Regions:
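Catalytic cores and adjacent flexible loops of soluble metabolic enzymes
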Residues: 1-220
Length: 221
């Protein structure tokens, strides 16, 4: 993630990495990895998806108690129960805390997965951010499947999230769909359409489906 000339590292090994086949980390294993990440100087550690299981909830709490330098983040959908679980899991953290909420913005995901119209998605983004803003140190909001979304609609969602209190906006290539130059052009277009992004940290999340994950990160930064 970059804000001006500052590049920060958001590590999601303990959340997205744990979705790899055959991987299930205990709270103690998450703590061991988190301590190593802290020693490496990682800025943000996404410790888990609090509502998904008691183990993930406890993993977030354990990581928050074990590290102090990195910000510890918990993932949440835009549902109130997700958001409250994330806040609760972070309540005893030693360092800075972040709730990372998300909702899909691509036409296919809005229609087939969410069953929502675009205005409803915008309202859910507003609700999610405003529900946790002030209860944790930072709020991140992601437009899931951003690269298959209309840039103008993504800009609207970003604007709404920032006005509600989001400090970081993430525009991920959720399904590993775009080439590096395509995602970079998409980011530039969204920034043009949403000048409010100057008030937030802009984040990218790249997948390696096409075996160009590292190249994608470099191009998008």
């Amino acid at each position: 993630m970059a804000h001006g000339r500052r590049i920060t590292i958001f590590d999601t090994t303990l959340r997205d990495g744990e979705q790899s086949p055959g991987i299930a980390l205990s709270p103690d294993e998450k703590v061991e990895i988190a301590i190593a990440l802290e020693r490496l100087g990682v800025d943000v550690i996404e410790a888990g998806f609090a509502i998904s299981s008691p183990g993930d909830f406890e993993g977030i709490r354990a990581v928050g108690a074990a590290v102090s330098a990195p910000t510890v983040a918990a993932l949440a959908r835009t549902r109130v129960e997700d958001l409250d679980a994330a806040v609760e899991a972070l309540a005893s953290a030693r360092g800075r805390t972040r709730v990372h909420s998300f909702i899909a913005t691509s036409p296919i995901h809005m229609e087939r997965k969410l069953g929502l119209e675009p205005p409803e998605v915008v309202e859910q983004a507003r609700f999610a951010v405003s529900h946790v803003a002030g209860r944790v140190d930072e709020v991140e909001f992601s437009c899931e499947d951003a690269t298959r979304s209309d840039p103008a609609f993504v800009a609207e969602v970003c604007r709404t999230a920032i006005e509600a209190g989001a400090t970081t906006i993430n525009l991920p290539d959720t399904v590993g769909y775009s080439l590096p130059d395509e995602h970079a052009a998409f980011l530039l277009e969204v920034r043009r359409l949403c000048p409010e992004l100057e008030r937030a940290t802009l984040s990218v999340h790249c997948h390696n489906d096409l075996e160009i994950g590292r190249a994608s990160c470099r191009e998008r930064v």
